[in-house]
Amino acid sequence: MPLSTTQSLLDSTPLNNVDARVLLGHLLEQSLGWPRSALVSKDQEKLPESLISQWLELEQGRLQGQPVAYLIGKKGFHGIELNVNPSVLIPRPETELLVDLAIEEIKCQITHSDQVLKLRVLDLGTGSGAIALALANAIRESDQDTLKIEVIGIDASSDAITLAHQNAIALDLSDVVQFIQSNWYTNIPKEWLGSFDLILSNPPYIDPRDPHLHEGDLRFEPRKALTDEHDGLQCIRLILDRCQEFLKGDGLIALEHGYNQAAQVRALLNQAGLSDVESRPDLAGHMRISIGRKAPKTPLANRS
């Protein structure tokens, strides 16, 4: 079958239908300015040879296992579209739970405040900026009049920080979200000690012996963002070791972790002296997020 039209490319590809349509739709949009609906409305129009060559390269990349998100350089996350590349993890649906939890916490604070709130949030291991930017975007769309928020994203990778900056600019969020290259807390300004209402993190938590590291998309993602090369809990220990220095009294920390790590992470939260420790399930019922709260300087019952 000659490869000359959208339909002929889709009919002849060994890729599954979903991947093929995402990749080809992206290519038509980028190369010809066609909307995704052109996969149907223009399925018989002759395509330029240059586009067909690009398609064959994308097709081959996917057949070799390269993630679709890296091939098109985009990934949707919690209502926003992010630029992604192999220097950062591909944002996943389960990480959206961290954003939802943060929104829940912020709404609770708004409910109990009779004035405009000013909140500062720290996203440790920000990668593409997914958590920081999704949270800032959600707040922008809802509670602008009752809340002023500042979000700080931290990552040890300079390439990740560059990409996160680009995403902030593309989403028009660079006025409320800033990114700092830092190995966890190392380069955070001292004047921010004790100033964060929320600390969020999706740290490297996969055990280095886990065979999944050699399967699927994980083969192509940055290993340092997946595993601590220890036991899957070392980065969580490092985060918890200093979290009380940076949290405000009554501030909350929320950590994503593996489906079988909840009990261990709760134990670490308790060891760090945090209160109200609990785990939250993902949509499949697996406990994937654990949280703890710093004790307030003044007990809530004694506040006026």
Label each region the model flagged:
Residues 289-304:
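C-terminal lobe and adjacent flexible extensions of AdoMet/dcAdoMet transferase-like proteins
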Residues 1-21:
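Non-catalytic nucleic-acid substrate-recognition regions in nucleic-acid-modifying enzymes
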Residues 81, 150, 176-178, 275-278:
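Conserved beta-strand segments of alpha/beta enzyme cores
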Residues 230-293:
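Conserved Class I SAM-dependent methyltransferase catalytic core
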Residues 97-212:
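Conserved SAM/SAH cofactor-binding pocket of Class I
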Residues 204-235:
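Mobile active-site "lid"/loop adjacent to the S-adenosyl-L-methionine
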Residues 23, 27, 65, 95, ...:
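Residue-level signal for inorganic ion chemistry
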Residues 26, 30-105:
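Conserved AdoMet
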